Regions:
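Loop-centered beta-sheet repeat module
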Residues: 223-259
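Bacterial N-terminal signal peptides
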Residues: 17-25
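Long, repeat-rich segments with strong aromatic
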Residues: 250-350
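Extracellular glycan-targeting catalytic surfaces
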Residues: 30-238, 273-276, 284, 316-319, ...
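Positively charged n-region of N-terminal signal peptides that target proteins for export
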Residues: 10-14
Length: 402
């Protein structure tokens, strides 16, 4: 049934009861997204389909990465932030462009949904590539037992976070700047979301037996603690926390992931307790429409992307042993169901969409797969839709993880 205003406060109370106290028994190294028990089963059958193709693709990718130097926020920097410190992360707003009516193009103006090619010359792209390397090396090591890959993952982590010459300062003050303005953007915090994707690799690398690495791993955790402090207490972070769209969801996902990784269990529990009320109920209306996302020029894309972030949040909760009931996720499922008819390319999306619908349809299919696989096995209809409209290819690395 719909979560209307009449039972809103009762449901809020129920959700808090569901969450309270359960985090205290979380294992010290519980994975965020990756299901380690499932990965162990996959590993025992890695030379058989449906896993062999994905494994071969993983190893091929890792071997190519082995040939390349480690990435850093220092060595691969094309632009220097206002601080003059090359260790400071820097990016520009993705949709900001030179003002063609001005001789110098300044200040930049917003063109929502249109990516300025300059965006790719800043640190954001390097960060995402670094995260992908750490994940790829770590998974290649786990499934192959070849220590070369673990060594490469550890080396990349040291270069980005620890090495004196190349480390990144634990903040993003100069993220998503708008050229021509001096203010610091609240959305800078969002660039850190890429780090969430490598936390599971850090957990897995705890099993890599190297005395020096375990010493360094403590330093990495300290770095993330400092980064988390910046996210939660800086003016940019405080402002971002008030966001009522996908950026607010992403902000809380980072906070949840880093609090868990740093062992700040009570903080993580508070974030979980507030999630349904603070994010889901305020972003999704009774019909399942994500009211802020449909205002965007890429409204379907942002609606799907926000579902993906919410899914990450929910999967983390489930993997930490929290029992999320279907009742507590009523509004979330409404949002998913609202998008499903538009998997059919003949069905016209009623709002503006300038981006690649095909890409986001496939991404929605992946979320339907994750819902059935990770959250609710009764959602067999979601699995059928996934298989009909956007099943993963055999060489997709996610085949090994879910």
């Amino acid at each position: 049934s719909d979560l209307g205003e009449d039972n809103y406060f009762e449901m809020k109370k129920y959700i808090v009861i569901v969450f309270t106290g359960l985090l205290m028994s979380i294992p010290a190294l519980a994975q965020l997204f990756w299901n380690k028990a499932n990965m162990r089963n996959v590993k025992m059958q890695i030379d058989k389909q449906p896993y062999k193709s994905a494994y071969d693709a993983l190893i091929k990718k890792a071997d190519l990465y082995l040939l390349e130097p480690h990435l850093s926020v220092v060595n691969d920097k094309d632009h220097i932030p206002a601080s003059g410190d090359i260790h400071d992360y820097m990016s520009i707003g993705r949709y900001t462009w030179p003002d063609t009516t001005k001789a110098d193009g300044l200040p930049y103006i917003e063109r929502d949904g249109y990516t300025n090619p300059e965006y790719y010359t800043y640190d954001r792209e390097v960060l995402l590539k670094m995260v992908d390397r750490v994940k790829t090396f770590t998974l290649a090591w786990y499934f192959s037992d070849d220590s070369r890959y673990a060594s490469a993952a550890v080396g990349q982590i040291r270069v980005w976070f620890l090495k004196k010459e190349t480390y990144m300062n634990p903040n993003m003050y100069y993220g998503q700047i708008v050229k021509g303005y001096t203010y610091l953007n609240a959305t800078a915090v969002l660039d850190g979301a890429g780090f969430v994707d490598m936390i599971d690799a850090l957990y897995l690398l705890d099993d890599y037996h190297s005395w020096m690495w375990h010493r360094d791993l403590k330093r990495v955790k300290k770095w993330f603690g400092q980064f988390l402090d910046w996210i939660e207490t800086s003016d940019q972070g405080v402002r971002q926390n008030k966001s009522r769209d996908n950026t607010g969801t992403s902000y809380d996902l980072q906070r949840l992931a880093y609090n868990l990784y740093c062992g700040r269990v009570e903080n993580a529990q508070e974030i979980l307790n507030n999630f349904v009320e603070k994010r889901i109920l305020k972003q999704i209306d009774d019909e399942g429409v994500q009211v802020e996302e449909i205002k965007r020029t890429s409204s379907f894309g942002y609606s799907v992307s926000n579902i993906s972030v919410m899914m990450n949040f929910i999967i983390i909760a489930c993997n930490q042993g929290l029992q999320l009931t279907p009742e507590s996720l009523t509004r979330f499922y409404k949002a998913v169901n609202y998008l499903i008819p538009y998997l059919d390319e003949n069905k016209q999306w009623p709002y503006q969409e300038i981006s690649n619908m095909k890409y986001y349809r496939k991404r929605l299919c992946f979320e339907l797969f994750r819902i059935e696989t990770c959250i609710d096995k009764s959602k067999t209809n979601y699995l059928k839709l996934y298989e009909k409209y956007g099943k993963m290819s055999d060489n997709d690395i996610n085949v090994l993880l879910y």
